Amino acid sequence: MGDHFIRHIALLGFEKRFVPSQHYVYMFLVKWQDLSEKVVYRRFTEIYEFHKILKEMFPIEAGDINPENRIIPHLPAPRWYDGQRVAESRQGTLTEYCSTLMSLPVKISRCPHLLNFFKVRPDDLKLPTDSQVKKPETYLMPKDGKNNAADITGPIILQTYRAIADYEKGSSSQMALATGDVVDVVEKNESGWWFCQMKTKRGWVPASYLEPLDSPDEAEDPEPNYAGEPYITIKAYTAVLEDEISLEEGEAIEVIHKLLDGWWVIRKEDVTGYFPSMYLQKAGQDVAQAKSQIKSRGAPPRRSSIRNAHSIHQRSRKRLSQDTYRRNSVRFMQQRRHQRPEPQRSRSALREQQQPKTERPKPQPAVPPRPSADLILHRCSESTKRKLASAV
């Protein structure tokens, strides 16, 4: 077994294929111990056969001897007819199944049977060709991992992009590009690395090397959020260009614009600038997985650093300048200061005005002089007079 093991298995979705006959295959993204990531395709019948053999190999953990000892997850048997809704509804089950497999003891999660099943096969590398009568239809899992069979509206058409320059891959999990190559984007990761496929190749590609076919602008780029989101830097970065910002590891910042190329606009006090999103993690979250991605791929290059870039569009993509970000950010923060602290200042001012009054000693009433004995005898009751007389 050695050091060869799987770190994580994620279900990307499923495909509806028509060759040799209509059937469905599930797409899994498998991350290995060397941080390489491979996409494999498996039918549900294959997964179920794998599951049955795994139970036979570990009868105690499968609960065959004592059901209370079962730790291997359950998996429903295939149906006689598997339609699209059935394929869709199984995604939640398979996601939980894979997650549980990875959490099992090492003797199961790293056994040869499991590792061999999720290795890349020759069929995984045979992508559909243009000569096929009907190409597969791809259905991707929602970002939040939730899926409902009632939400099926049709296949997800993978977006097509064009390479604006040559790109040499830096690792086995990446894909090389030549200027003019047209790729289908399977996943747009916030890090700025997109998982793409092209003919018989698949791999991660920096988004900065790709452009949409119909427009130079990225339609899915969100609007700036000057309220900001709290993040923590998990790796130091020294600015290379004037519009970037240098930060040390562990600094608290606010993200005000998340761009799909992986270079986000952040704010540190009143300073704004570009910073690689791969070096950021939401405040309060575990940074271990984020740091593993840095080791695997690193920050993607910025488009402004690409040499010999050639776009098919007449105009360049629209981008806000750092002066605009800074001006809008300062304006927003000034408005926030005026809006929020006002009631607090007014209340504190009122307390300050009232405080001296409460601290001043109140004037004490004058103590009247003690009445003389003659006055007491003259004004008191008969009972008091008798008591005084007896006392004397």
Swiss-Prot record:
Annotated Basic and acidic residues bias: 376-385
- Its transmembrane ranges are none
Q: Indicate the segments forming the PX domain, all copies.
A: 4-125
Membrane topology category: Peripheral membrane protein
* Any one Pfam family match given in the protein's UniProt record, by short name: NCF1_PBR_AIR
UniProt cross-references to InterPro entries, sorted A to Z: NADPH_Oxidase/PX-Domain, NCF1_C, NCF1_PBR/AIR, NCF1_SH3_1, NCF1_SH3_2, P47PHOX, PX_dom, PX_dom_sf
Under the heading PROSITE patterns, the entry gives: PX, SH3
Q: Describe the processing and modification events after translation.
A: Phosphorylated by PRKCD; phosphorylation induces activation of NCF1, leading to assembly and activation of the NADPH oxidase complex.
List, for all copies, the residue spans of the domain called SH3: 156-215, 226-285
Q: Name one GO cellular component term.
A: cytoplasm
Q: Please name the Gene3D superfamilies in this protein's record.
A: Phox-like domain (3.30.1520.10), SH3 Domains (2.30.30.40)
Molecular-function GO term, any one: superoxide-generating NADPH oxidase activator activity
- Is Metal-binding found in the keyword set? no
- Give the location in the cell: Cytoplasm, Cytosol; Membrane
UniProtKB keywords: Cytoplasm, Lipid-binding, Membrane, Phosphoprotein, Repeat, SH3 domain
Q: Where is the composition biased (Basic residues)?
A: 310-319
Cross-referenced SMART domains, in alphabetical order? PX (SM00312), SH3 (SM00326)
Q: Which GO terms describe its biological process?
A: protein targeting to membrane; respiratory burst; superoxide anion generation
Asked if the keyword Repressor belongs to this entry, the reply reads no
Q: Where is this region: Disordered?
A: 290-392
User: Which residue positions does Phosphoserine occur at?
Assistant: 304-305, 321, 329, 348
Show the PANTHER family listed in the entry. NEUTROPHIL CYTOSOL FACTOR 1-RELATED, SH3 MULTIPLE DOMAIN
Q: What is known of its domains?
A: The PX domain mediates interaction with phosphatidylinositol 3,4-bisphosphate and other anionic phospholipids. In the autoinhibited, unphosphorylated state an intramolecular interaction with the C-terminal SH3 domain precludes phospholipid binding and interaction with CYBA. Phosphorylation disrupts the autoinhibited state.
| Subunit architecture | Component of the phagocyte NADPH oxidase complex composed of an obligatory core heterodimer formed by the membrane proteins CYBA and CYBB and the cytosolic regulatory subunits NCF1/p47-phox, NCF2/p67-phox, NCF4/p40-phox and the small GTPase RAC1 or RAC2. Part of a cytosolic complex composed at least by NCF1, NCF2 and NCF4. Interacts (via C-terminus) with NCF2 (via the C-terminal SH3 domain). Interacts with NCF4. Interacts with CYBB. Interacts (via the second SH3 domain) with CYBA; interaction is phosphorylation-dependent. Interacts with NOXA1. Interacts with ADAM15. Interacts with TRAF4.
Q: What is this protein called?
A: Neutrophil cytosol factor 1
Query: Origin organism of this chain?
Result: Bos taurus (Bovine)
Organism phylogeny: Eukaryota, Metazoa, Chordata, Craniata, Vertebrata
